[in-house]
Amino acid sequence: MKILVIGPSWVGDMMMSQSLYRTLQARYPQAIIDVMAPAWCRPLLSRMPEVNEAIPMPLGHGALEIGERRKLGHSLREKRYDRAYVLPNSFKSALVPFFAGIPHRTGWRGEMRYGLLNDVRVLDKEAWPLMVERYIALAYDKGIMRTAQDLPQPLLWPQLQVSEGEKSYTCNQFSLSSERPMIGFCPGAEFGPAKRWPHYHYAELAKQLIDEGYQVVLFGSAKDHEAGNEILAALNTEQQAWCRNLAGETQLDQAVILIAACKAIVTNDSGLMHVAAALNRPLVALFGPSSPDFTPPLSHKARVIRLITGYHKVRKGDAAEGYHQSLIDITPQRVLEELNALLLQEEA
């Protein structure tokens, strides 16, 4: 059986989608699974053994471009896929499998995609509370799994593999010392400061960890580099020698390898949180207005700290006013306690 998956366009969603690929492979061991996704996803997809080929989606996230999607779909006809799974909810994301003439096209209804999809699932959000459950459910025939409780346990969570050789090579590439164990911080998050633990809290935690004998490495995109510099600026000269701001300095694949080399990770609710979980790194995840009830880190080594309940809409406009109070209220001491408990467990 040949399968095409139209993958998501965000790091976290792409990581969670691996649970679908793992489930499909477990159900259909001979299946060949290709994933169409933005080209930047290739470093993640290349580490997923279930994925045969990562096919770059050449069209932008927001562009409809029906003519181009028709052309793209027609170009895939020679691959003769038997099934397609469409993970984004948008109308346009269902066009390529339709134009490719794939006989069985599965996805949640989303933007009223009757016709484009011929195996349409209607989402009951209460029956399927977690995004990863919604992805996995698509691997089963319609009607068999009525709620998340019906899914076979344990769920096949995302797993990325990184070799020891890759870790030592990449640490050397960035001149990271082998004298001290690394703790990774992921201080960025989409939509500005609203989902971020304050930089001054990260700085205070970094001071304590460096004084305890660790080195701290900051990960993220170029947008997070300034936040990293704010953390660095709060440290004294001696401490700064053991803190590296690599936000915006690494390719995604290098960040994956270096996160795998860390003893533990402290992170906001971000795509890199899901990467760290898939690498089975001990991690402390800090949530504020966004809720871990929908997209928690999928790992038994994760501790979530959140001081409020429910879902609070994160608006870009509000974010300009600064950090969310519920994240300000999470103290560095609380995070350090959770982190130390995880590190002790890891050594046991």
Map each language-model feature to its residues.
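Catalytic machinery of carbohydrate-active enzymes
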Residues: 1-348
